[in-house]
Amino acid sequence: MLNTSILNAQQAIPLYDGELPNAKPCNEKDHEFIDTSWMKSGILVVDHITRPTITVFEPPAEKRTGTAVIICPGGGYGIIAAGHEGADVAKVFNEAGVTAFVLRYRLPKDECMTHKEYVPLMDAQQAIYFVRSHAPQFHIDPNKIGIMGFSAGGHLASTAGTHFNPVRNELANANLRPDFMILIYPVISFNEDIGHLGSRDNLIGKDPDTKLVHLFSNEEQVTPKTPPTFLVHASDDDGVKPENSIRFYEALLKNKVPAELHLFEHGGHGFGLHNTTTSEDWFKSCINWMKANKLLP
């Protein structure tokens, strides 16, 4: 049973009890800072994560809907943008009655882990398991637990939404399928023509095996069992090509998976909650989509 004082304080909860799977000794220490190079107000950046955590943001009791979302911030698998793609998003979900969990997943590094290409997925699956197994404590419906990701966090979320087989044998009997996905300017593909090669290099290496490229090109992994998905992208995104979202959407349609895609004309990459080039609020559209799919009342 989790300590309610920890939950109310929005304290980071260790993702694993005891020894970290796939970890090996290294000199890195957890580190975060405010980066002002990208925007004047600065963004919260985490560039070293040795102990993955999950932080719960609970809505007021009178607003609870029983729906939950696990949020994976982006950062090219080299950093995590923990503020505008993490905590800020969790807080607006709370206003809609959704319990939100911000995941600080391990960043793939050969010197700190074995089989680095599977470690972020391992952490995402552990987060899904954690939330489902603690659903009563969080007043959550175990059948309304989704995963959300921005940029490379969208790659991780879409990987979790297309790869249900457990990375760890310890979770062999667990239900690791998210009930829905929300993907915001996501990296989807690792193929040369549209893939984000920085994310690919960090996760599977600069000269990857073609089998790994296929495995982690999630537009090629969609099946009828893939969960309903809401996608947002900007047409002028020169960081992660909009074809990532378009091809994933096409794969969802082909497999008759409920899906909705919002393509802005402008907005670029990394706008978080606020695409300032338009009056359209993608988050409101997302909430409406969740209601239409009976994920929210």
Predicted segment positions?
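Mobile cap/lid helix-loop segments that gate and shape the active-site cleft of serine hydrolases
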Residues: 33-39, 186-221, 227, 254
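Short beta-strand element of the alpha/beta-hydrolase
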Residues: 65-74
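Catalytic nucleophile-loop/oxyanion-hole region of alpha/beta-hydrolase
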Residues: 80-82, 87-90, 105-142, 274-281
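Primarily recognizes the serine-hydrolase "nucleophile elbow" in alpha/beta-hydrolase
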Residues: 122, 126-195, 213
